[in-house]
Amino acid sequence: MEDWVIVCQDITKIYRMGEVEVQALRSVSLNVRRGEMIAIMGPSGSGKSTLMNILGALDRPTSGEYILDGEQVSSLADDQLATIRNRKVGFVFQSFNLLGRQTAQANVELPLRYAGIRTGRRTRATEALEAVGLGDRLQHRPSELSGGQQQRVEIARALVNNPAIILADEPTGNLDSKSGEEVLRILLGLNQQHGTTLVFVTHDMEIASRTERVIRLHDGSIAGTDRQRVSVDGEKATWRLGIGDS
């Protein structure tokens, strides 16, 4: 039996602006296995951001079913969605979204504070920062850190609650190539060493090429899926599946 952490069935999202309706997603069905690493790609306006918002419990679909880590979240109230987000989703955004007056350690503690966790909060934040190579930067504020280090603080914050999934939206977009590679290696290591489920939303083919599966969106629908596997000599082979395969 498959262990699905994400199950989306016929997800449709319609935005209404006055009398005008914009259909951002059209009957999207997508399953993601626990421990899988995928990329969602597509041109601007393809529905990537809308799908990410739904997967991250930041928004609800207009219709369809979304089950995250065994919980039906499609029709939850705002406060229930907030609880699901805090417990089950870690976010890594292109912009670092750190509190400028707080230390790295305090920034990483935030999800634990929101969850009402008091015991061991500082220890868990410290361990998360050590996991991304920032054990010597606990008391540094964002202004005292490089861009790559700030992004690593955000990764530590994303993983401190042991989420079911981590959503990474263009995680290297604001970084130089060296810092971007360091951040990408940390994220890939979380998947390979700890089985963390990773969903990248990206335009970057380099990121996509290092995942197991690429979901291609076009005009709000899944236009196809590229599956990737590692051959005997370590090189990746890619083959294309038909429209809507997941």
Residue positions per predicted region:
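H-loop (His-switch) and adjacent beta-strand-loop-beta switch element
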Residues: 214-227
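ABC-family P-loop ATPase nucleotide-binding domain
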Residues: 1-14, 224-246
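ABC family nucleotide-binding domain
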Residues: 4-217
